[in-house]
Amino acid sequence: MNKEERAKRQSKIRNFSIIAHIDHGKSTLADRILEKTNALTQREMKAQLLDSMDLERERGITIKLNAVQLNYKAKDGEEYILHLIDTPGHVDFTYEVSRSLAACEGAILVVDAAQGIEAQTLANVYLALDNNLEILPVINKIDLPSADPERVRQEVEDVIGLDASEAVLASAKAGIGIEEILEQIVEKVPAPTGDSEEPLQCMIFDSLYDPYRGVIAYIRVVNGTVKVGDKVRMMATGKEFEVTEVGVFTPKTTQRDELTVGDVGFLAASIKNVGDTRVGDTITHAKRPAAEPLAGYRKLNPMVFCGLYPIDSARYNDLRDALEKLELNDSALEFEPETSQALGFGFRCGFLGLLHMEIIQERIEREFKIDLITTAPSVIYKVFLTNGEDMIVDNPSNMPNPQTIDRVEEPFVKAAIMVPNDYVGAVMEICQGKRGTFIDMQYLDETRVTLTYEIPLSEIVYDFFDQLKSNTKGYASFDYELIGYKPSKLVKMDILLNSEQVDALSFIVHRDSAYDRGKVIVEKLKELIPRQQFEVPIQATIGNKVVARSTIKAMRKNVLAKCYGGDISRKRKLLDKQKEGKKRMKSVGSVEVPQEAFMAVLKMDDN
């Protein structure tokens, strides 16, 4: 293409993404938009087309972002090129959302006509405003009997401060209002700015590993043009590659000769190493590089850590490969090797949150067929020692001796919880039980409240979300952000089996709840660990002090079965001999800890 053609094409490009709270219907809306623009034949159409992972389809949530190019003939008779970038809505995947928004000029804000605005709707809107996107409100599910579009329209204006007078009333399921949405995108979303003659700048917003073509980078071209055969350079790592193919997604990958300003597509350059394409990096030409990289989004720091160990220790290397491949598509995952006396070799992994952790675990078990044992999740603590040094602890077994500790600080988050009036009491109770500090309470309208609490991250990690959902019948929604570290009275609790410490069961707990927690775990382990030939004491200790104990009784053979009547001293002799044997066994015997026992430590708040 020459310069004029490129400029004309650029004026017809519209890049947008869809943002919404979980379950407000954004994947269905994406399906309807694909149908309306005839991106697919009827035969290829299936529900939630852009959720390509099995896991996404099963759980009905979007995890990875996805990009599609669509052609749309608008009412003004012109052909427009729309790039739809689908985003997840769950709080753990905010970083996926911030990546997709960085590649767009506009966003469709989907709000459920029955439920109104929820916590993540707000969080995502603020992300969109930070990226200076044009926001088009759409009120979805208007065909529901409980829909109240006018109230929701008012809510959008009051809570978010967007002008909702032209908000489209739609039902993605019934296909109502889809055309209006497309027309609004064409009218209101600005065309991409940028110059096709400038040095190349492409933003990598995702990547994928293909065993035949190497790493495939998903890119948005901001300036310049990239063709097959160009030599390109990654600005963060400085590595250079020759482009082997470029193209776009029309959900399927379709090869093109070149990508130019405003295009959203993919680039392959036989990149072998996963670490060479960092998401958020800028690609430029090797011969004529751009002066500086694009302002990528920030690198996210993991909040939750846990150990992953293969059940079969021979598969340690397979687990490393699996983690490396997942890390490629998931820039927020971090891992490093660690060893445990109880579990052998494995990895300490960092995640954004519990859902993220669960999904990575499930993907490893599913896609790579490796059975895993996971240890209790923990957060990063700062430990200040009496000699003036300080250290960072992300694994309870690295906690120093309590005598040497001056104070321990833990990360706190500011949690904004949106909840209907009727459940305010229940939510406050949960937050207080989780050592939360009440900060603020605001009424959004007559029926909904936003509560703000400061809560230690370690309390949210366990099962805060599950409790919140179950105690508010699923109506509460919440969003959190880190606010920094504060001192807390924390102690490390060890579990001893047969007076040997099991390092994988150690955890860090607040001193006030240590006794109860210890008691619960000890009882739970007693149920789960199979009986041995000798008796096994289970103890929960803090430092050298035992706070809870329980004993698994020994199994014993009836050694008196063969004595009919007979002298008591004969029986004594047999019983003493048995006792002697059990004692010897106890001094050398070791106890197998089943996988359920490790899981029990995670789920101990259930009772």
From Swiss-Prot:
It is found in: Cell membrane. Residues 11-193 form the tr-type G domain. The keyword DNA repair does not apply. It is an enzyme of class 3 (hydrolase). CDD domains: EF4_II, EF4_III, LepA, lepA_C. GTP binds at residues 23-28, 140-143. The gene is lepA. Its EC number is 3.6.5.n1. This is Elongation factor 4. Required for accurate and efficient protein synthesis under certain stress conditions. May act as a fidelity factor of the translation reaction, by catalyzing a one-codon backward translocation of tRNAs on improperly translocated ribosomes. Back-translocation proceeds from a post-translocation (POST) complex to a pre-translocation (PRE) complex, thus giving elongation factor G a second chance to translocate the tRNAs correctly. Binds to ribosomes in a GTP-dependent manner. It catalyses: GTP + H2O = GDP + phosphate + H(+). Signal peptide: none annotated. One of its GO terms (cellular component) is plasma membrane. One of its GO terms (molecular function) is GTPase activity. Pfam families: EFG_C, GTP_EFTU, GTP_EFTU_D2, LepA_C. InterPro entries: EF-4, EFG_III/V, EFG_V-like, EFTu-like_2, G_TR_CS, LepA_C_sf, LepA_CTD, LepA_IV. It is a peripheral membrane protein. HAMAP family: LepA. SMART domains: EFG_C. Belongs to the TRAFAC class translation factor GTPase superfamily. Classic translation factor GTPase family. LepA subfamily. The keyword Magnesium does not apply. It comes from the Bacteria.
